[in-house]
Structures are given as structure tokens and as C-alpha cells.
């Protein structure tokens, strides 16, 4: 009698965040099906968990139109080759992790060949280019969504979707230790502390840093003991921020940090940040915040017409109301930002209410996402 083939899962991750998700999923699946086989496009973490890499993840990790155009032929070749090889292999399930521009077409190709497909991490279809939901519905058997309002969106279009919670909510404690974080950063337990996070992209740091620094200067007038911590994602962004600081606020003393964004949020009484994943992380760190964002006028004009949501920050989208002040474009200026931050630094009723809501929202999306994702894969594989 022929030996039964082990459970075979094909995966494609396109960047570091996807590699982390893929590794967590593989770990959860291996705990239940020790002899399962994992193949595809994998980063170092997925490979360390036993995923056989047909291509290195870096091959897909390109950003920006110019870079993508330069690599387009190679990307199309990889996608065609994966379609052919996965079709030959006939895995039990294919899991495309994020990287929607690459993965959703691949998922559609494989679904036509009778392979069950999962898209892990919903693109922001609920916010803009909503018609993409129809292609996603045609291409996948199941979307795994981090956030409850994402599932509600897919339900409207009858696209199978499972809310699994957010891995970041699983990783972060419900009650972070502010004093321990301050000890790590060398900040007094008694001082007022503000975190400035002007974004991870060069364009964001260029647009926001001057206003954020001027805001800190204004707040120092009310709180002379104010410690300002600025975590920057890499050396390039740090150099850029230092250049802007030398021009607009050379005398302002700040703690520049290499990475350590999470520690800065946990340690701070309030944060001023660009929108994006940082706002979700700040919510999970239980740090009251103000979101300030500015973009080129034409980009903003276009975004206002394309974006279908009332809010830009994830805490507000989760709460369904303006929990966190969002100051965009012309409103993103030092006096308005400082005015919004003052009550948060006072550490009174406003910040305590925000903290309590953050904790409730954290509990809502803390669902052991790795295990939930593994459940979905195994159910589909049957």
C-alpha cells in the first residue's frame, strides 16, 4: 500500500512582517501535524521553522513604482514559475501572506487549478479601491483578517473571511510596565515624557519632523521637565531627522533611539505619531496619542476622494468613533498638535479614559492569531 503523502502547505511571504506571520503559522501547524511539509517563498524565520524555500523572500520585497518596474520581468517570471510548480505539487492549501499585488493573482491562478487558497492579512480594501474585493473573492477560498471591521466588510460582499485577531495584540501585554520601559531608556519615573514618531518612510519624516519638533518646543513651555524620545527605524531616517532638527530646533534636547519604538511608547505619557501600524502599536502599549499627518496637496486631494472611511487611524476604526485626535494636512501644525497633547500629558481624566478604552480594544483583538490561522488552514485542508 502506497505511503500517504504528508500534509503539504505552500506559502508565499513577501516581506519581514509576512515572514514573522508565516513562522508563527508553521509553528502552530507543526505542533498539530508534526510531519507536515512547507514549501514556497520564505524568509529566514520561516526557513528556521522548516519551510523549504524555492525562492528567497527578498526577491519579492520591492517597494515603490520605479523599483517594481525595474524588477517586473523577474517578478512575473517568479509568479509564473510558482504557478507551474505549485500546480504540479498540488498542495493541500496555498497561503499567500500579505503582498497582495503579487499573491492575489497567484491565488487566482492556483484556485483555477483546483488548489484551495487562503489570503492571510486583508489589504485595505475597506478603505480604498473597494472593487478589489471581487477579485479577492474570485481568487481565494478564505481571507484571514486581523481586525473585526475587516470581516464585517467582507461579509457584506459574501467573501469568506475569518477574523483571527492580531498577532501584535497577542505579543504585547495587556498591562505594560511603564517604569521598566523608562529604566531601559534612562528616563526618570517622575518626568513627563513624550514620544515623537514621524513615520518610517523618508517622505513622512520629511513632511512631519519639523512640525513635531516645534510641537515639543511648545509643550516644554508648560512642562519644563518634558523628556522627548524619538525612535527612528534605521540609520537613514535618523540622519534625515537629525538634519531637520539642526535646522528647526537645534537647542531642543531629545533622546534619539535606534528602533525601540515599542519601548518609547510604553515609557511615554503621550505620543505624537504618523498614522499606520504605529498607531495600533501605540494603542496596544496603552500610550495616549495624537495622530498628525501631512502629505503633498495633490496626494491629499486624491486620497480624500478615494478613501471611504471616516478615520485614518486604526484605534479610531476599531472604536468606531474619534477616540484619538487626528490632525491632518493644514490642521497638522504645532499649536493645534500641542493643544491636543496637553490634556494627555496632564495624565488626568482624558488620558485615563483613553487608556481604559485601549485596554478593551486590545482584549477584542487578542485571540491567539497563530492558532486561529492554523485552525483555518487545517479546516480548509480537509
Curated annotation (Swiss-Prot):
One of its GO terms (molecular function) is phospholipid binding. The keyword Transferase applies. GO terms for cellular component: membrane. Its EC number is 2.4.1.182. Belongs to the LpxB family. It catalyses: 2-N,3-O-bis[(3R)-3-hydroxytetradecanoyl]-alpha-D-glucosaminyl 1-phosphate + UDP-2-N,3-O-bis[(3R)-3-hydroxytetradecanoyl]-alpha-D-glucosamine = lipid A disaccharide (E. coli) + UDP + H(+); a lipid X + a UDP-2-N,3-O-bis[(3R)-3-hydroxyacyl]-alpha-D-glucosamine = a lipid A disaccharide + UDP + H(+). It comes from Citrobacter koseri (strain ATCC BAA-895 / CDC 4225-83 / SGSC4696). It is an enzyme of class 2 (transferase). Pfam families: LpxB. The keyword Lipid metabolism applies. This is Lipid-A-disaccharide synthase. Keywords: Glycosyltransferase, Lipid A biosynthesis, Lipid biosynthesis, Lipid metabolism, Transferase. The lineage of its organism: Bacteria, Pseudomonadati, Pseudomonadota, Gammaproteobacteria, Enterobacterales. Condensation of UDP-2,3-diacylglucosamine and 2,3-diacylglucosamine-1-phosphate to form lipid A disaccharide, a precursor of lipid A, a phosphorylated glycolipid that anchors the lipopolysaccharide to the outer membrane of the cell.
Amino acid at each position: 500500500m502506497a505511503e500517504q503523502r504528508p500534509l503539504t502547505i505552500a506559502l508565499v511571504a513577501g516581506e519581514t512582517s509576512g515572514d514573522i506571520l508565516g513562522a508563527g503559522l508553521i509553528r502552530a501547524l507543526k505542533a498539530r501535524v508534526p510531519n507536515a511539509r512547507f514549501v514556497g517563498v520564505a524568509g529566514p524565520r520561516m526557513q528556521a521553522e522548516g519551510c523549504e524555500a524555492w525562492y528567497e523572500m527578498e526577491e519579492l520585497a520591492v517597494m515603490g513604482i520605479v523599483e517594481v518596474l525595474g524588477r517586473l520581468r523577474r517578478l512575473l517570471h517568479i509568479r509564473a514559475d510558482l504557478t507551474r510548480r505549485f500546480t504540479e505539487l498540488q498542495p493541500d492549501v496555498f497561503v499567500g501572506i500579505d503582498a497582495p499585488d503579487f499573491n492575489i493573482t497567484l491565488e487566482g491562478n492556483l484556485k483555477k487549478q483546483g488548489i484551495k487558497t487562503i489570503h492571510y492579512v486583508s489589504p485595505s480594501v475597506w478603505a480604498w479601491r473597494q472593487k478589489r474585493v471581487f477579485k479577492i473573492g474570485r481568487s481565494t477560498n478564505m481571507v484571514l483578517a486581523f481586525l473585526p471591521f475587516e470581516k464585517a466588510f467582507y461579509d457584506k460582499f459574501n467573501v469568506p473571511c475569518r477574523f483571527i485577531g492580531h498577532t501584535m495584540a497577542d505579543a504585547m501585554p495587556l498591562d505594560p510596565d511603564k517604569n521598566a520601559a523608562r529604566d531601559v531608556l534612562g528616563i526618570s519615573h517622575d518626568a513627563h515624557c513624550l514620544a515623537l514618531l514621524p513615520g518610517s518612510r523618508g517622505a513622512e519624516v520629511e513632511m512631519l519632523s519639523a512640525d513635531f519638533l516645534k510641537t515639543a518646543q511648545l509643550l516644554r513651555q508648560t512642562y519644563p521637565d518634558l523628556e522627548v524620545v524619538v525612535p527612528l527605524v534605521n540609520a537613514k531616517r535618523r540622519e534625515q531627522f537629525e538634519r531637520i532638527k539642526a535646522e528647526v530646533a537645534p537647542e531642543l534636547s531629545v533622546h534619539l533611539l535606534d528602533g525601540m519604538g515599542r519601548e518609547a511608547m510604553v515609557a511615554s505619557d503621550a505620543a505624537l505619531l504618523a498614522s499606520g501600524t504605529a498607531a495600533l502599536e501605540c494603542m496596544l502599549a496603552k500610550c495616549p496619542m495624537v495622530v498628525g499627518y501631512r502629505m503633498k496637496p495633490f496626494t491629499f486631494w486624491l486620497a480624500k476622494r478615494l478613501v471611504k472611511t471616516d478615520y485614518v487611524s486604526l484605534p479610531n476604526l476599531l472604536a468606531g468613533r474619534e477616540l484619538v485626535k487626528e490632525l491632518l494636512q493644514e490642521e497638522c501644525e504645532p499649536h493645534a498638535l500641542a493643544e491636543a497633547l496637553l490634556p494627555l500629558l496632564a495624565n488626568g481624566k482624558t488620558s485615563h479614559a483613553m487608556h481604559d478604552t485601549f485596554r478593551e480594544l486590545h482584549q477584542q483583538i487578542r485571540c491567539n492569531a497563530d492558532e486561529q490561522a492554523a485552525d483555518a488552514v487545517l479546516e480548509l485542508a480537509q
